[in-house]
């Protein structure tokens, strides 16, 4: 019998594209190359939609309007002058000055379409020095993306998102902060349910929180017209990525007039958001000078956050932006759960004010940029008993002002890209179900504490733990190895290490004296 040939599994479309594009990177840094690739994907997409609209105008008898900007803008299509179209770039791909032609095209598109102001790379292609032959080959790769092949499938969005994640992985530790892993964003969306109102991200990176919010609404049969998007981003290049990302999805967002520091140049001072989704920089140091922002309105009723770490500055900034029924879901390093001094005083006040709704410990290695342990915080301005209408379903929320839900998801992730962890759709659904059951009054379904998974603590429980929000202090663990008191162990290590340093200092002092007495004084 003839040996059966094993059929090779076909790679997903976006993976094949990535492989082809990455081979052409050469010596260009990944952090720079992403702007080249993503800009070309964006240019291909808006050119395809432009050509489709142009054809529609001709076919419907509006040929005389084919060069009128309003004829495109009315359908959220960007108007492109001839030298800015993909067809022009493709025709000139083999020219030595193709980099300059692409820069000119992007610059012209910005000038022609006000909503894209500040969105596109400025003279990026000319500056990076990618050879004309490699740039031509990359144009051929991007040309394989049929952005309009299936009107029911977000092909270009899928490719853009895939490339963002791959670039974040490629840049690795210390970089790639522009991207929050998709499964984390999905979890936040499922917990805070941003169906209707203003959504805000004070450190929006490439805009992933907004994209997943829209996907959440669409998957739950809601209307994206019911939300408005607000964001801010400090890094200019990432700000451009976000504006392109939103434009590709047809999301109208206000990301501020410029890329700017959220603390010192808030682009949305008067904003009151219904939902906040954020992944602030972890343990950001020197975020303000010692004499800056001391009496800022955002800290009203709280201590001024320390200059050494911005974690609590981010928390208070977000609290100040919430509407009276606003909810925030954000990621912080685990250090914020138990910090002492000023941080502890702010945390105590947040708990006493009934703002902290849930603390969820996440697995390590979920982020492409760091191995640091992190937690998801849910902060809610209104934990009182009330009814809300979501997607046509009435939810009766019970009073939770005196409670905080702790959850531990450290063992609930699954392997991803060999060395990373992500949440499956099933796990996200289970966690959301637990959280919403805890929030609500349901006659047929009641919340229960589950060992090694979840525990509902009251303010008295938390006060007994000296206002620590470390989940393992509350959740019961059957495996005692998991039930390690982090604070106690770290304080013990700190004490031991302090003793060792004192012993070393004494030994050094004695050794220096010996050499001095011998007439060979050592200068340090």
PLM segments and residue spans:
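Non-catalytic, mostly N-terminal accessory regions of nucleic-acid modification and defense proteins
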Residues: 1-195, 254-267, 361-364, 382, ...
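Conserved Class I SAM-dependent methyltransferase catalytic core
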Residues: 16, 23, 32-45, 239, ...
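Short, contiguous acidic/charged loop-to-helix segments that flank catalytic cores in large enzymes
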Residues: 27, 287-309, 334-342, 363-369, ...
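Hydrophobic alpha-helical scaffolding
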Residues: 128, 149, 203, 231-235, ...
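Conserved S-adenosyl-L-methionine
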Residues: 174-278, 283-302, 313, 333-334, ...
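Feature representing long, continuous alpha-helical segments
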Residues: 211, 240, 278-280, 312-316, ...
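Active-site lining segments that contact anionic ligands and/or coordinate catalytic metals
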Residues: 272-273, 309-311, 325-331, 356-357, ...
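Accessory, often C-terminal, charged low-complexity segments
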Residues: 283-304, 311, 344, 349-351, ...
């Amino acid at each position: 019998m003839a040996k059966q040939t094993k059929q090779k599994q076909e790679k997903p479309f976006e993976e094949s594209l990535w492989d082809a594009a990455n081979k052409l990177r050469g010596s260009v840094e990944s952090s720079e190359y992403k702007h080249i690739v993503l800009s070309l994907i964006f240019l291909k997409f808006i050119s395809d939609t432009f050509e489709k609209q142009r054809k529609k105008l001709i076919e419907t008898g509006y040929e005389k309007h084919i060069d009128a900007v309003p004829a495109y803008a009315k359908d959220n299509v960007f108007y492109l002058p001839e030298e800015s179209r993909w067809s022009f770039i493709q025709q000139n791909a083999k020219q030595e000055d193709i980099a300059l032609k692409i820069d000119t095209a992007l610059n012209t598109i910005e000038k022609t379409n006000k909503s894209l102001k500040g969105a596109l790379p400025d003279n990026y292609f000319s500056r990076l020095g990618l050879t004309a032959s490699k740039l031509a080959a990359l144009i051929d790769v991007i040309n394989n993306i049929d952005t309009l092949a299936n009107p029911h499938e977000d092909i270009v969005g899928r490719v853009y998102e895939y490339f963002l994640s791959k670039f974040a992985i490629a840049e690795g530790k210390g970089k790639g902060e522009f991207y929050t892993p998709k499964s984390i964003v999905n979890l936040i969306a499922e917990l805070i349910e941003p169906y209707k109102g203003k959504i805000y991200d004070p450190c929006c990176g490439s805009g992933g929180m907004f994209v997943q919010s829209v996907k959440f609404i669409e998957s739950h049969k809601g209307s994206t017209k019911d939300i408005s998007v607000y964001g801010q981003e400090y890094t200019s290049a990432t700000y451009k990525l976000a504006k392109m990302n939103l434009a590709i999805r047809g999301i109208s967002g206000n990301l501020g007039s410029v890329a700017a520091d959220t603390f010192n140049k808030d682009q949305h001072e008067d904003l009151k958001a219904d939902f906040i989704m954020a992944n602030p920089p972890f343990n950001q140091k020197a975020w303000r000078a010692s004499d800056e922002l001391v009496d800022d309105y955002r800290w009203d009723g709280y201590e001024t956050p320390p200059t050494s770490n911005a974690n609590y500055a981010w928390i208070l900034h977000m609290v100040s932006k919430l509407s009276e029924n606003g909810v925030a879901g954000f990621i912080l390093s685990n250090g914020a759960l138990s910090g002492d001094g000023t941080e502890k005083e702010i945390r105590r006040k947040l708990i006493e004010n009934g703002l902290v709704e849930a603390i969820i410990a996440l697995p390590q290695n979920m982020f492409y940029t760091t191995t640091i342990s992190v937690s998801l915080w849910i902060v809610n301005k209104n934990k009182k008993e009330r009814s809300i209408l979501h997607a046509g379903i009435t939810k009766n929320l019970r009073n939770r002002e005196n409670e905080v839900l702790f959850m531990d998801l450290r063992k609930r992730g699954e392997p991803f890209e060999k060395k990373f962890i992500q949440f499956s759709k099933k796990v996200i659904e289970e966690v959301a179900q637990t959280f919403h059951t805890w929030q609500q009054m349901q006659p047929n379904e009641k919340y229960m504490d589950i060992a090694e998974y979840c525990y509902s603590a009251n303010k008295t429980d938390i006060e007994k733990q000296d206002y620590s929000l470390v989940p393992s202090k509350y959740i019961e663990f059957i495996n005692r190895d998991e039930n390690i008191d982090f604070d106690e162990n770290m304080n013990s290590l700190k004490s031991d290490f302090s003793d060792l340093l004192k012993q070393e200092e004494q030994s050094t002092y004695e050794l220096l004296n010996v050499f001095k007495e011998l007439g060979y004084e050592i200068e340090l």
